[in-house]
């Protein structure tokens, strides 16, 4: 599967990713979170995702940015993403550097869409 094809999570949820989470190597993309608005029932919110995979091994998820105004973790994971190469790991590392991307883009603690706080959901 190329990086332009989507990973389909439809059997489990309505989320989709535009990178193959099972492929070897390093890829950057977005998880698409469905979101309806008045102008379109088919909108989505992009959540940045990075996959680094090298052979068999443990699966690790790293996440930051539950609160958009807490930059330390987001910056730290951004630095890690730039520094890590597939040959540096064994297994699969999935990174969500800005889990609440709309809040991060606004520099706000909660989502500007619905005032939601991911730590209180």
Predicted features by range, described:
Residues 1-121:
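Structured catalytic-domain cores with a bias toward divalent-metal coordination
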């Amino acid at each position: 599967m190329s990086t332009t094809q989507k990973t389909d999570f439809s059997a489990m949820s309505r989320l989709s990713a535009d990178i193959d989470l099972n492929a070897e190597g390093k890829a950057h993309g977005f998880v698409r979170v469905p979101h309806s608005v008045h102008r379109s029932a088919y909108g989505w919110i992009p959540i940045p995702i990075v996959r680094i995979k090298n052979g068999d091994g443990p699966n690790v998820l790293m996440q930051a940015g539950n609160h958009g105004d807490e930059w330390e973790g987001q910056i730290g994971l951004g630095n890690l993403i730039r520094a890590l190469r597939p040959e540096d790991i064994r297994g699969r590392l999935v990174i969500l550097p800005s889990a609440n991307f709309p809040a991060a883009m606004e520099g706000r603690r909660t989502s500007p869409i619905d005032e939601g706080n991911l730590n209180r959901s």
